[in-house]
Amino acid sequence: MIMGQYLFWLANAHEPIENRIPELPNFISVLYHRFQHTTWAQFLHRWENIIFAILVASLISLVAYLGARKKEIIPSKFQNLLEIAVEKFSHLILEVLGPEGKAYIPFLGTLFIYIFTMNIFGMVPLMKAPSSSLNITAALAICVFCLVQFLNIRNMGIFGFLYHLAGSPKSMLEWLLAPLMFSLEIISQLSRPLTLALRLFGNVLGEDILIGTFALMGVVMISSVETFVGIPLQLPFMFLGLLTSFMQALVFTLLSTVYILLSMHKEGEKN
């Protein structure tokens, strides 16, 4: 009912609808529409992506705490399912990183669960997918970038890493080309978090816009009969959204795994 009212308001607002980005309402946007002149509503509206990101993190932490507290000698079907999922995920990471990758499974597993939960959070009524904000996806990409650079410096040393960025020159010609190689490698390093952030942001935002557009169409189609209950045209796309949410979380995690692999140099490459 609230969704229909809010989308109906969007369709009949004074601002032309073609200038708006169709998006399913969340409880913060509903409160802001009702109390937009109050300070607290403006604060919530300004920081809504951060608030939803914190809500997702809190929800995951709560579920993990409750799940860990109720350990059973004979595992339930749900616990068996989770154990199988963790085992498959760990096997996937170890296939890419090798035995040394065991240390990175907690980080990569947390990254996958957090991103996937954020992606599907927008499908919950009156919630929003925080990963549809570039600020959130950029923060995640920067975390991966910082970890990769830390591993590079730890494995090769600062000067060894700079030498690697220059293309590991040995001959005179290679030293002459070192500034060019250094510039290209810097661009390559910086493009990694940029592409990670933009890919996740663009796909999740596009998914939300698609669902919001069809939800709005369902309301507008029967607006003439003066009802706030629209046709659920967005329902098929929500099932598709579950698949794309999983795939985007998996792609982000696998690319992060590859970047970690590229930073795991052999001891002989240290300077």
Curated annotation (Swiss-Prot):
Compartment(s) of residence: Cell inner membrane
PROSITE patterns: ATPASE_A
Name of the protein this chain belongs to: ATP synthase subunit a
Free-text function comment from the UniProt entry: Key component of the proton channel; it plays a direct role in the translocation of protons across the membrane.
Residue spans crossing the bilayer: 47-67, 107-127, 133-153, 209-229, 235-255
Similarity comment: Belongs to the ATPase A chain family.
Keywords annotated in UniProt: ATP synthesis, Cell inner membrane, Cell membrane, CF(0), Hydrogen ion transport, Ion transport, Membrane, Transmembrane, Transmembrane helix, Transport
